[in-house]
From Swiss-Prot:
Exhibits a very high intrinsic GTPase hydrolysis rate. Involved in the addition of a carboxymethylaminomethyl (cmnm) group at the wobble position (U34) of certain tRNAs, forming tRNA-cmnm(5)s(2)U34. InterPro entries: G_TrmE, GTP-bd, GTP-bd_TrmE_N, GTPase_MnmE, MnmE_dom2, MnmE_helical, P-loop_NTPase, Small_GTP-bd. (6S)-5-formyl-5,6,7,8-tetrahydrofolate binds at residues 24, 81, 121, 457. GO terms for molecular function: GTP binding; GTPase activity; metal ion binding. Homodimer. Heterotetramer of two MnmE and two MnmG subunits. It comes from the Bacteria. This is tRNA modification GTPase MnmE. SUPFAM superfamilies: P-loop containing nucleoside triphosphate hydrolases (SSF52540). Its EC number is 3.6.-.-. Keywords: Cytoplasm, GTP-binding, Hydrolase, Magnesium, Metal-binding, Nucleotide-binding, Potassium, tRNA processing. Mg(2+) binds at residues 232, 253. Gene3D superfamilies: P-loop containing nucleotide triphosphate hydrolases, Probable tRNA modification gtpase trme, domain 1, tRNA modification GTPase MnmE domain 2.
Length: 457
């Protein structure tokens, strides 16, 4: 029997131990599993309390069972659910009983969702939305993923595809029956008007979703600077926990430390890097190299100033175009909080150039950190752009729709040069949008997507 024809089961709730655990079974033998273990199949969509027994008649647990007859189920197949007490012993006994039934096996990661997709219960964009929802860290990410799961992009793409097929049919009819006089001479005009409108809609969707993938992937902020400038202290202050070791000795941080923050709903990865300086220590040299690389690839760099070190940021991380803020730390020690320090004085240091933002803080005491966080939040508002309300949430979506819009534009440009050429470009656009929805040529995408799901989903 092919694996996709076998019945699958998995824990669909949290890790044990727990008060309640939900074990889901999907496939042709789901009803058999209920009969063998629960004694009977309950009324559809009705919870029933039963004593579960293994195939030798030994009691497993006092539990609740439910039955969802396919295709009116989450996967489109027959589905059974066992709601048991969430101890490892109970679950192991239930798993052993299920495994002893012919053609029933443990599920692979994402296999329930893959079966739902293959049975037409969800499209590929909705499956991607579910993946994003499972991995959402912030409320803004959750809301974006939920809209995707509810079909925001899928519904729009299906309508585009339907209208393109209608327009293509008109043009194909004009090609097939032009010599028979069955089709009006102006058949091409309404079809191409529809094509032009759909192209504009796709382009407007792309424009309205500019940089929308950013909310899903998050922003990276690197804390860089010379040794002992207080980078780890600032990381801990922003993370509100002891994520990095703090020491008065220079060179304590030798590797890159990452902390994930929820900044007013925006996902931000904060990176603490090794102090950048010239050193003969090979381990510290590797840390400095990694620090430079991560700072150069970050979306924003916070450079902690050190008045005792003349090394400027442009001398250490290069001119990569990464936004850079200068943060003067240890104002409680240097006296900058009361000496009336002029921000322009800092801009004039050799090799530093004109820097857009300056902040004076004490990472150890917290002075000025609230202002820095407020500035980071404001920066995030602009950096994430339309991500929260975007229709497009993945680079895959963007690439496909850009190609579809290009094909439609090419179809418009080919008017008068042969209806066959126009029709072919429209067919390409139809196939592309079908690929967006998961209708054609997407096995490689499915394997990658569902591999990232947890077992039981």
């Amino acid at each position: 029997m092919h694996p996709r024809e076998q019945t699958i089961f998995a824990l669909s709730s949290g890790r044990p131990p727990s008060a309640i655990a939900v074990v889901r079974v999907s496939g042709a033998e789901a009803g058999t599993a209920l009969q063998e273990i629960a004694g009977a199949i309950p009324v559809v969509r009705t919870a029933k309390r039963v004593l579960l027994r293994d195939l030798l008649g030994e009691a497993i647990d006092d539990a609740i069972v439910l039955w969802f007859a396919g295709p009116a189920s989450a996967t489109g197949e027959d589905v059974a659910e066992f709601h048991v007490h969430g101890s490892r012993a109970v679950l192991n006994a239930l798993f052993a009983a299920l495994s002893s039934i012919d053609h029933v096996r443990p599920a692979e990661p994402g296999e329930f969702t893959r079966r739902a997709f293959e049975n037409g219960k969800i499209d590929l964009t909705e499956a991607e939305g579910l993946d994003d929802l499972i991995h959402a860290d912030t409320d803004r990410q959750r809301r974006q993923a939920l809209r995707q799961l509810q079909g925001l992009l899928g519904d729009r793409a299906r309508e585009w595809r339907r209208e393109l097929i209608e327009a293509s049919a008109l043009i194909e009819a004009g090609i097939d029956f032009a010599d028979e006089g069955d089709v009006p001479d102006d058949l091409l005009k309404p079809a191409m008007e529809k094509i032009a409108r759909l192209r504009r809609e796709i382009e407007e969707t792309l424009a309205a979703s500019a940089q929308s993938e950013r909310l899903r992937d998050g922003m990276t902020v690197a804390i860089a600077g010379p040794p002992n400038a207080g980078k780890s202290t600032l990381l801990n202050r922003l993370a509100r926990r002891e994520a990095a070791i703090v020491s008065p000795y220079a060179g304590t941080t030798r590797d890159v430390i990452e902390v994930h923050l929820d900044l007013d709903g925006y996902p931000v990865t904060l990176i603490d890097t090794a102090g950048i300086r010239e050193t003969d220590d090979p381990v510290e040299q590797e840390g400095v190299r990694r620090a430079r690389d991560r700072a150069a690839s970050a979306d924003l760099v916070l450079w902690l100033a050190d008045d005792d070190n003349g090394v400027g940021p442009s001398q250490t991380i290069g001119e990569g175009g990464v936004p850079l803020w200068l943060v003067r730390n240890k104002i409680d020690v240097s006296g900058a909080e009361s000496d009336g320090a002029n921000p322009r004085q800092l801009e004039a240091k050799p090799g530093q150039g004109i820097l857009p933002r300056h902040f004076w803080i004490s990472a150890s005491r917290g002075d000025g950190v609230d202002e820095l966080v407020a500035a980071l939040t404001a920066f995030s508002d602009g950096w994430f752009g339309s991500g929260e309300t975007a229709v497009i949430t993945r680079l895959r979506h963007r690439n496909i729709l850009q190609d579809a819009a290009a094909s439609l534009a090419k179809a418009e440009a080919l008017i008068g040069q042969g209806d066959e050429l126009v029709a072919e470009e429209i067919r390409i656009a139809v196939r592309l949008i079908g690929r967006l929805l998961g209708r054609v040529d997407i096995d490689d995408i499915l394997d990658s997507l569902f591999h990232d799901f947890c077992i039981g989903k």
